[in-house]
């Protein structure tokens, strides 16, 4: 697994994300803050990670209603997915014939692996993270009909609302945004304790479930 490059993220944005100590000097994914944590990249190069983070933040921006892709660490989620079996197309039937103009509900039907789609697509977004928000939106509209944008948009939503065990939804900000309590085993105790009250339980991750510490998604990375 490649650990030569890594991101620096704000602890305020990504509460609960594991700190990795590496020898190389970190670079900033977002503006410098008082505290930061370093997260190794497993697939993206540093420039690619900056572009993906900026693009995801335009697809799912934070606003007055709550956090967005930046706070959820979506770029880390996508990096982990591409580094794992999904990025290498382990889960998809990849032999011919390939459908032309397939309906959107069929999902991605191309020959290239997700890794290849991202690598090629990111070439067209060189310098994207240096553009203004208006310029970024215009650039994304230009590629809106491409397989790359379809994957990026899908992965951004996944990274917002996945279980944090997969690298996104940091501190369960996505679940808190929509009021999802997570994969709870039972609500009996809360029903008895808060009977007759308006109650929204704090979300819990798979990692907090019995045996959750043994779950290691994506460990067959190259």
Question: What is the meaning of each model-derived region?
Answer:
Residues 10-12, 22, 209, 218:
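Low-complexity, intrinsically disordered/propeptide-like segments
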Residues 36-37, 47-54, 65-222:
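Mature-region segments of soluble proteins
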Residues 1-17:
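N-terminal secretory signal peptides and thylakoid transit peptides that target proteins
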Residues 8-9, 29, 33, 141, ...:
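Intrinsically disordered, low-complexity segments enriched in polar/charged small residues
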Residues 1, 17-57:
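C-terminal segment of N-terminal export signals and the immediately downstream linker at the start
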